[in-house]
Amino acid sequence: MSTSVAENKALSASGDVNASDASVPPELLTRHPLQNRWALWYLKADRNKEWEDCLKMVSLFDTVEDFWSLYNHIQSAGGLNWGSDYYLFKEGIKPMWEDVNNVQGGRWLVVVDKQKLQRRTQLLDHYWLELLMAIVGEQFDEYGDYICGAVVNVRQKGDKVSLWTRDATRDDVNLRIGQVLKQKLSIPDTEILRYEVHKDSSARTSSTVKPRICLPAKDPAPVKEKGPAATTSPSNPGTEATGTSPATPTP
């Protein structure tokens, strides 16, 4: 896309434009297509219904202007009630693990824990909007085809924002996507980003899932050299030293 989503935010607020008005800038008369068509879904949890029955599609869009029109007319992520979710996925991909585009994939997970309650709304809105602009604006470069969609889960115990990718085995691709995500969301080095495999999440027996990849909070302490031939790295080096975990995750 030649013009970024952020640069075109003002275009969405222009309303109907009179084409005969010579004073109207030409860019306000032009719609700016996105590379993909996107679907926004909403879910409000109801224990009396099946999960899929609670999931509703809100809208489809494929231009910058329609993106901002939709975003500006729905409740912000920070304003959603507990138990609510937003899902933004490429058209044709359902926001569920079982979808053929997601079943072999995983997600990068950003947690806004309850200890940050005082700035929770601001932080959640920032993470969600920056993530939306990054995916619809194709800011992941050549890795955009691996991206399926984004999710925000609003929970009293702690909110979650996640980016779903289609192939959990491509550690190189997912690591790079995670690095871009960290930069786009301005996530500080004190926060740890986790990449979780959907199959591990669906089969979990506890509240936590061992991540396949981590972007560590800080670089590990350097290893002391024992001699010229010493090449030993810290135990479990894949996660902390390089940002990747062993090739085969442990459930």
Curated annotation (Swiss-Prot):
Location(s) in or outside the cell: Cytoplasmic granule; Cytoplasm, Perinuclear region
UniProt KW keywords: Cytoplasm, Initiation factor, Protein biosynthesis, RNA-binding, RNA-mediated gene silencing, Translation regulation
Disruption phenotype: RNAi-mediated knockdown results in maternal effect lethal (Mel phenotype) and masculinization of the germline (Mog phenotype) phenotypes. RNAi-mediated knockdown results in defective activity of the PIWI-interacting RNA (piRNA) silencing pathway.
Tissue distribution: Highly expressed in the germline (at protein level).
InterPro entries: TIF_eIF4e-like, TIF_eIF_4E, TIF_eIF_4E_CS
Record's GO cellular component terms: eukaryotic translation initiation factor 4F complex; perinuclear region of cytoplasm; RNA cap binding complex; translation initiation complex
Note: Inactivation of ife-3 results in 100% embryonic lethality.
Family: Belongs to the eukaryotic initiation factor 4E family.
Functional description taken from the UniProt entry: Recognizes and binds the 7-methylguanosine-containing mRNA cap during an early step in the initiation of protein synthesis and facilitates ribosome binding by inducing the unwinding of the mRNAs secondary structures. All 5 eIF4E proteins bind monomethyl cap structures. Only ife-1, ife-2 and ife-5 bind trimethyl cap structures which result from trans-splicing. Translation of trimethyl cap structure mRNAs may be regulated by intracellular redox state; disulfide bonds change the width and depth of the cap-binding cavity determining selectivity to mRNA caps. Ife-3 is essential for viability.
Protein's recorded name: Eukaryotic translation initiation factor 4E-3
Organism of provenance: Caenorhabditis elegans
